[in-house]
Amino acid sequence: MRTNDLLADLERGDAAALARAISMVENQREGFEKLLAELHKKVGVRPTHRIGITGPPGAGKSTLTEQLVRAYRERGLKVAVIAVDPTSPFTGGALLGDRIRMESVSLDPGVFIRSMATRGAQGGLATTTEEVADVLEAFGFDRILIETVGVGQTELDVAATAETTVLVLVPESGDGIQTLKAGVMEIAELYVINKSDRPGADKLRQEIEVMLGIRKGNAFVNVRPHHGPTAAKRSGGAGEGRRDPAAAKDSWEAPVLMTVATKGQGIAELVATLDRHHDFLQSSGKLEERRRRRLAARTRAVLNRAIRQWVLDETEAEDLLARRLDDVAAGTRSPYDVAAEVLNKVRNGK
């Protein structure tokens, strides 16, 4: 199908065309860049909220995502879910599965669910995910939920493409909180302790709040025995932090919420907090700041992808690379020597 025809079908709201467009972007088929360039004109026009949902396996992210979908649909919002499963670089096997637990919401015409496994897509998984999110936003979705299967660097890069990142933990995560702290904990705007009816939930909440207090330069945050403070509660009130109220308007203090997704507990508060964070991003100007940073990073990623493809499309350069890889493996050449030789071949034909 020609790109112009596909764009026309998307304009008409054809769901089948949406699926084809996403496949085109995922697999970088001919015309995908033209498609994205045209759809880019519609990105940022409507108040779409991109929400990243990440956390260790077994935290109940899919169930939590399903509950969010239900809550948003009750408000009449169109919801898309991108379930990101990075592919094993060794076997090429993806951990996909069709998210069977979401079958009940997938039948809703106002819901679109897509599992992604890119098998080493050029330009990186995060770039591809963001491009797919652009297609969904241009199609008219109000909420785009980006769910990852774990907390590795790839998943964190994907989650970082969202405007709001939710880190989902379970009471059993408490033992590993110190290791999580180094990378995962820093990316979240909102922490959710799911399965909070299990022992250890309150203790984990306290540990997270103490960690957040230390990060903000206040090691003596008040710890509350209820279902997690809101951003407003934690930044205001006597004795609850010593921050300038004026400065608080331009900053967001990540709340810790408690949920039991299988029972729907805490979902209303989670939805309200997500809305509040999006409002904060808009009113503070940080949404535009993030958008500009993301677009700058994306432009560089797209340029890198184009350069890489340009090099590999040069048949002689590709043949030279294939021959020199044996030399690298044998230890007679270094990767740097070979890269320089291939680039010289592309530039000068020598």
Write out the residue ranges for each language-model feature.
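Long, well-ordered amphipathic alpha-helical subdomains in the mid-to-C-terminal portions
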Residues: D250, L257-A261, Q265-R347
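Alpha-helical scaffold elements adjacent to nucleotide-binding pockets in ATP/GTP-utilizing enzyme cores
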Residues: L95, E131-V132, D157, T161, ...
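Glycine/charge-rich, flexible interdomain linkers and switch-proximal surface loops
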Residues: L36-P57, T65, T87, Q153, ...
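Short beta-strand/turn micro-motifs at beta-sheet edges
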Residues: I100-R101, G176-K181, G241-A247
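Flexible active-site lid/hinge loop adjacent to a nucleotide/diphosphate
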Residues: P171-P199
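Canonical P-loop GTPase G-domain recognition
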Residues: L190-D279
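Short, basic, low-complexity termini and linkers enriched in Ser/Thr/Gly/Pro
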Residues: R242-R243, N348-K350
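Nucleotide-state-sensitive switch-loop elements of NTP-binding domains
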Residues: R2-A59, T65-T154, T161-G176
